[in-house]
């Protein structure tokens, strides 16, 4: 009988997707020990099998979610499944675009793959964590792996600088989270997020408000929201580009998953307070991210500030707190996965062929490399929210949900900053397409012959084609994707509380 109760409460099948990722970590480390030649051959295969198995197991869990696993410290509900699927896909595409880059930089492939999978493991666990301790362990697993990835190019001083900055700021964020968690535990006597929420309903004290601010600071750091964004441009510019691609989607998605869960369970009785703080963060992120991006000369720094602005758009859906708003937030993160990684695929390919990421060096690229020009143009147009791209429909759903919930200021700021973002996205496209041959940059004039047969480039080509195709076919895919996102929200029990509160307020 005791064994039966333990089995029921454990529900270990909830983390089968994470178990496959863990097996992938072990496998890549083992082949790495066998030598670089063996690792180059087998590490990608192990990663594909690991992530593919994880995605299949997530699909099987979709119709039969496992809740209350590991004695209440993990929930594999439909919302967690959706976010974990986005993270797994982002890892798969990030690895596809990284093999050639890693080989060309002379870094060990097996070791790199193991660290990326470790970050993925932490991010996926964070999506379903329902306990302060499991949240911290997941958060640190993701963070430590991210620090290692940022400084992976050991011979590049910019990479080392990026890792050090990321480590210092990330350590401060972790300390702030622990400080806030200690307040919550002291007030409730529990580490379970839902239990804490019940215990602090009748304790709207200064200490509880302080804990909310500390936890929100950690969330803002993970999603790179202003004013907790200072690390983002420098880390993005100095880190290896495939690492930046992963951090811009995987880490951000995990941060939003954590935000939705803790705000709608632990701080459900502080609905007005956290929505006000989130509104301020969203406005600052959309405004500063898109305005400062105008002045950037590096493609990676431009995309860094763009990602700050994109986080602000997602926050519109979360602040609305309605069924449509939360569904739109999930949909936009799924869309962001493809359009952002598609853009990074083009940036990596251009960097591999030229060694540059300066925006001016893209001048006249259409004449030498039409594929990169077309792919990057479509992805940038989608990020800007122009029809008929996937990003347009994602923003439409977010703005409609925000307007229906009377978040007029957020929607107006979102519309204005979207127009600003379109300007700097189209400036890059214009530079690539409109320039005459004699106006092309020196790097484009000496552009190397295109050869897709080089080892590591075929996977990058697959990733590029996939991302661009999904981004361009947004009009066809937006409705089924929104239905999936809507199902993830409607069939997640804990979200009904925050939706009910939002409906009562409206």
Curated annotation (Swiss-Prot):
GO BP annotations of the record are:
ATP synthesis coupled electron transport; photosynthesis, light reaction
Any idea which GO molecular function terms this record carries? Answer: NADH dehydrogenase (ubiquinone) activity; quinone binding
* Gene Ontology terms: cellular component: plasma membrane-derived thylakoid membrane
Into which EC class is this enzyme placed? translocase
The secretion signal range is none
* EC numbers: 7.1.1.-
Q: Which UniProt keywords apply?
A: Membrane, NAD, NADP, Plastoquinone, Quinone, Thylakoid, Translocase, Transmembrane, Transmembrane helix, Transport
Q: How does it sit in the membrane?
A: Multi-pass membrane protein
Enumerate the subcellular locations listed in this protein's record, separating them with semicolons.
Cellular thylakoid membrane
Classification via Pfam families: Proton_antipo_M (PF00361)
Q: Which domain of life is it from?
A: Bacteria
| Cross-referenced InterPro entries | NADH-Q_OxRdtase_suN/2 (IPR010096), ND/Mrp_TM (IPR001750)
Q: Which reaction does it catalyse?
A: a plastoquinone + NADH + (n+1) H(+)(in) = a plastoquinol + NAD(+) + n H(+)(out); a plastoquinone + NADPH + (n+1) H(+)(in) = a plastoquinol + NADP(+) + n H(+)(out)
The regions listed as transmembrane in this protein's record are 14-34, 42-62, 79-99, 108-128, 132-152, 167-187, 206-226, 240-260, 276-296, 302-322, 330-350, 374-394, 409-429
Spell out the subunit comment. NDH-1 can be composed of about 15 different subunits; different subcomplexes with different compositions have been identified which probably have different functions.
What does the similarity note say? Belongs to the complex I subunit 2 family.
Function of the molecule: NDH-1 shuttles electrons from an unknown electron donor, via FMN and iron-sulfur (Fe-S) centers, to quinones in the respiratory and/or the photosynthetic chain. The immediate electron acceptor for the enzyme in this species is believed to be plastoquinone. Couples the redox reaction to proton translocation, and thus conserves the redox energy in a proton gradient. Cyanobacterial NDH-1 also plays a role in inorganic carbon-concentration.
Q: What is this protein called?
A: NAD(P)H-quinone oxidoreductase subunit 2
Its source organism is Prochlorococcus marinus (strain AS9601)
Q: Which gene encodes it?
A: ndhB
């Amino acid at each position: 009988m005791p064994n039966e109760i333990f089995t029921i409460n454990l529900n270990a099948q909830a983390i089968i997707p994470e178990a496959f990722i863990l097996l992938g970590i072990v496998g890549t480390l083992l082949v790495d020990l066998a030598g670089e030649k063996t690792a180059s051959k087998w590490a990608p295969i192990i990663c594909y099998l690991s992530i593919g198995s994880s995605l299949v197991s997530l699909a099987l869990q979709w119709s039969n979610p496992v809740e209350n696993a590991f004695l209440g410290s993990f929930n594999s509900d439909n919302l967690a499944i959706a976010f974990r699927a986005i993270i797994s896909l982002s890892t798969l595409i990030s690895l596809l675009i990284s093999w050639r880059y890693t080989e060309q930089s002379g870094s060990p492939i097996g070791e790199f793959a193991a660290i990326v999978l470790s970050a993925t493991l932490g991010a996926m666990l964070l999506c379903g964590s329902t306990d302060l301790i499991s949240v911290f362990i997941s958060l640190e697993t993701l963070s430590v792996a991210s620090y290692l990835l940022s400084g992976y190019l050991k011979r590049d001083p910019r990479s080392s600088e990026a890792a050090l900055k990321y480590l210092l700021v990330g350590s401060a964020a972790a300390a702030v989270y622990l400080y806030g968690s200690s307040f919550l535990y002291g007030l409730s006597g529990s580490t379970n997020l839902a239990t804490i929420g019940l215990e602090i309903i009748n304790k709207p004290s200064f200490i509880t408000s302080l804990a909310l601010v500390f936890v929100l600071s950690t969330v803002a750091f993970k999603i790179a929201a202003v004013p907790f964004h200072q690390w983002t441009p420098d880390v993005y510019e100095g880190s290896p580009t495939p690492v930046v691609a992963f951090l811009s989607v995987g880490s951000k998605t995990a941060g939003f998953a954590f935000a939705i869960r803790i705000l709608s369970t632990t701080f459900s009785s502080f609905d007005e307070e956290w929505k006000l703080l989130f509104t301020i963060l969203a406005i600052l992120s959309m405004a500063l991210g898109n305005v400062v991006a105008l002045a950037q000369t590096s493609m990676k720094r431009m995309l860094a500030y763009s990602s700050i602005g994109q986080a602000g758009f997602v926050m519109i859906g979360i602040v609305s707190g309605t069924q449509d708003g939360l569904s739109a937030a999930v949909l936009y993160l799924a869309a962001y996965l493809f359009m952002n990684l598609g853009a990074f695929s083009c940036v990596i390919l251009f960097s591999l062929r030229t060694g540059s990421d300066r925006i001016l060096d893209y001048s006249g690229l259409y004449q030498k490399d039409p594929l990169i020009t077309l792919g990057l143009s479509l992805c940038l147009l989608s990020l800007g929210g122009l029809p008929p791209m996937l990003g347009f429909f994602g923003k439409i759903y977010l703005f409609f949900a925000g307007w229906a919930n009377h978040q007029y200021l957020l929607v107006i700021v979102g519309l204005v900053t979207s127009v600003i973002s379109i300007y700097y996205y189209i400036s890059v496209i214009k530079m690539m397409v409109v320039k005459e041959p004699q106006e092309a940059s020196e790097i484009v004039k000496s552009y190397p012959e295109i050869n897709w047969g080089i080892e590591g480039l075929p996977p990058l080509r697959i990733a590029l084609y996939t991302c661009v195709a999904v981004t361009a076919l947004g009009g066809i895919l937006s409705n089924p994707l929104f239905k999936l996102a809507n199902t993830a929200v409607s069939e997640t029990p804990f979200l009904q509380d925050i939706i009910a509160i939002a409906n009562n307020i409206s």
